[in-house]
């Protein structure tokens, strides 16, 4: 900003602060006050969306928050700046939970974030997102995923029973050991769920492959939820608050099986028999 040290001799006359001539301190103050009165009042800016990439330390790990509206190029620049800053909130080997909310991220963008974190000896452990596309991209990249529910729709015409239902999450990949997938609806996996992997769903779980990990359907108390797999060999099965595991004796010939609750107990049946019964 440039400020002139000359005072307009017309100001005193126009403001009633004294005759033109030598400028006293009082006259100078009066002139400045007149200038301030002549400027338009500052307006308060409305609340805006977050525009900063931020880290927050928590007990579960280091949360990395990426704003929804920030251009991707700016996300990269800000993240590099935060990671290279002298004062850090972490030590080498810390785990990171990436929180992106409604923002869409594809596979290459997730890979770029992973590589920047890895360069600082940080481990991207989980991605929290509202968007199914981001959840799918993260799972395909081998990352654990927690898909959160979107804000409820303001639609009074929709029946209450249909409001807030999450769409099924469809994945064409294999969940490896250490991966965790959390979704507020039904999960469909075309691939295997290996030992050490976990699926938690509010709805059903369908695995078009071999289920060897942990599966928890109806996680918020839905006792009518089902767990289906072409080969059901899990470490643990959970439906609502019931817990079970597959039999140590595999079927003579591998057949699709389904787990369900009946009489407050988890039962496992061959799919064809279950279909006839239900």
Curated annotation (Swiss-Prot):
Disulfide pairings: none
Name of the molecule in the record: Probable septum site-determining protein MinC
Sequence similarity: Belongs to the MinC family.
InterPro entries the UniProt entry points to: CAP/MinC_C, MinC, MinC_C_sf, MinC_N_1, Septum_form_inhib_MinC_C
The entry's keywords: Cell cycle, Cell division, Septation
One Pfam family named in its UniProt record: MinC_N_1
Annotated source species: Gloeobacter violaceus (strain ATCC 29082 / PCC 7421)
Functional description taken from the UniProt entry: Cell division inhibitor that blocks the formation of polar Z ring septums. Rapidly oscillates between the poles of the cell to destabilize FtsZ filaments that have formed before they mature into polar Z rings. Prevents FtsZ polymerization.
Example GO biological process: regulation of cell septum assembly
Superkingdom of this protein's organism: Bacteria
Subunit architecture: Interacts with MinD and FtsZ.
